Amino acid sequence: MTGPRPIECPVGRFFVSKFGRKRRGSPATRGRLVGKRHISERPAVVQRRRQLGHWEGDTVMGADQRHCVLTLVERVTGYLVMKKLVARNKEQAATALARAIEQLQERVRTITLDNGTEFHDYEKVEQAYPVKFYFATPYHSWERGTNENTNGLIRQYLPKGMCMRHINQADCDAIAA
């Protein structure tokens, strides 16, 4: 017999699926960014793309879900900076952001990021450098379209499923050039 089998009961016939009931997962426990600046709070000049120094950032994950690359893209010029992260955690990301800001000096005014847990230490970087961080709406990747498009282009060199353990900073610099 194919399909669900009927069961007789006092109320009527019910069909029992072989897959059973859908189980619901527990709520996310990965933490939330409290007091973050929303992307809608960015100055209007950022949206118009008339002024240099406004960046979008994200991480490109490797197959092992540990090693990844931090990408920062300037919104007007499309200039790309890539930093290798040994682990996808907030300490590594904050260090990489600080190195990128030092490398770019006064050319960074704002950075717009997604809500990943790796960016939860943004306040430390904000206190150390004259940069303001903004965060996109969760699951609205198109709000950082320049960065998402660039990450797609980076995937030509670092395809999905590739282990990034053996990628080093020199490789990242060569891809970004």
Label each PLM-derived region with a short phrase:
Residues 68-69:
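Short loop/turn microsegments at loop-to-beta-strand junctions
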